[in-house]
From Swiss-Prot:
Keyword Manganese attributed: no
Protein's name in the database: Acetyl-coenzyme A carboxylase carboxyl transferase subunit alpha
Superkingdom of source: Bacteria
SUPFAM superfamilies per UniProt: ClpP/crotonase (SSF52096)
Pfam families, sorted: ACCA
Sequence similarity: Belongs to the AccA family.
Domain CoA carboxyltransferase C-terminal as annotated: residue spans: 40-293
Upper lineage: Bacteria, Pseudomonadati, Pseudomonadota, Alphaproteobacteria, Hyphomicrobiales
Entry EC no(s): 2.1.3.15
Species of provenance: Mesorhizobium japonicum (strain LMG 29417 / CECT 9101 / MAFF 303099) (Mesorhizobium loti (strain MAFF 303099))
Assigned GO CC terms: acetyl-CoA carboxylase complex
């Protein structure tokens, strides 16, 4: 069953009523309810459309975190063939919060790095809820270096609340690992594309998102800190998370206006969680279009990337 968010209550009431009427009709306990179902379905669609056309930044945070949104592994299954995963950092161990490897995208070889949160209790624990440890970032660096060596474009899928803040991660050099991954991302000679598919949290996201092109899903978020964290620091009050979300400019629309990202990928009505296959296909189409542009360009991708991020620093 669909997991409704708190602000979706009006839509939830309508959709549950529709399900109830359909069940009664199937069991022969009600007659002549077709017109009522049609009327309620229209009301439900209209309510959902109106709701999602006017989402507040805090509501977008909730949508970006929705457990039913397609995750990194869903995009890999839906867009790529012959995926061959790479494991381990050749230093400490394997971190499954980072899923990476090589595959074919519409016939062309690509390197993929993504952050995976997991979709149920078992997989969330296995993937550490998408919070990457140092060995995950070092695995990402391995993939970047291999992509550069074999001249294969890099695609990254960003979905993390932030890097893992545990004591063990700090002891193993979390800050250094994030910095090295960011540096490796910037130093690539091959073209790179990054898509924020859910949460883009702090340095944990930036470490794999400093790409030539950065895209965001319509209801994704991208920020230096979570709204809760910002509220705790600024006001010593986590109940002001809504205020923080509004003032931090974390939505795709805000970031496109600020020229932090390059384009927004539209989501189906009601968000990616209601029609995962549609948003995965739309993401694939934009990636294909961008790769075609890259293939026909006589560009120094490393220099273009350098200028892109230096320009941000000059303008903000």
């Amino acid at each position: 069953m669909y997991n409704y968010l708190d602000f979706e209550k009006p839509v939830q009431d309508l959709e549950l009523k529709i399900l109830e009427l359909k069940k009664l009709a199937e069991n022969g306990e009600a007659v002549d309810v077709a017109d009522e179902i049609t009327r309620l379905e229209k009301r439900s669609r209209d309510a959902l459309r109106d709701l999602y056309k006017a989402l507040t930044p805090w509501q977008k945070v909730q949508v970006a975190r929705h457990s039913d949104r397609p995750h990194c592994v869903d995009y890999i299954k839906g867009l790529f063939s012959d995926f061959t995963p790479l494991a381990g950092d050749r230093n400490f161990g394997e971190d499954q919060a980072i899923v990476g490897g090589f595959a074919r995208f519409r016939g062309e070889p690509v390197a993929i790095i993504g952050q995976e949160k997991g979709s149920d209790t078992t997989s969330r624990l296995r993937h550490n809820f998408g919070s990457v440890r140092p060995e995950g970032y070092r695995k990402a660096v391995r993939l970047m270096e291999l992509a550069d060596r074999f001249k294969i474009p890099l695609l990254t899928l960003v979905d993390t609340a932030g890097a893992y803040p545990g004591v063990g991660a700090e002891e193993r050099g979390q800050a250094e690992a994030i910095a090295r991954s960011t540096s490796a991302c910037l130093a690539l000679k091959v073209p790179s594309i990054s898509v924020v598919i859910g949460e883009g949290g702090s340095g944990g996201a930036i470490a794999i998102a400093t790409a030539n092109r950065v895209y965001m899903l319509e209801h994704a978020i991208y920020s230096v800190i979570s709204p809760e964290g910002a509220a705790s620091i600024l006001w010593r009050d986590t109940t002001r998370s809504k205020d923080a979300a509004t003032n931090m400019k974390i939505t795709a629309q805000d970031l496109l206006e600020l020229k932090i990202i390059d384009a927004i990928i539209p989501e189906p009505m009601g968000g990616a969680q209601r029609a995962p296959e549609k948003v995965i296909a739309a993401t694939g189409d934009l990636i294909a279009k961008t790769m075609k542009e890259f293939a026909g360009a006589n560009t120094d991708f490393r220099e273009q990337r350098r200028e892109k991020y230096l320009a941000m620093g000059r303008s903000l």
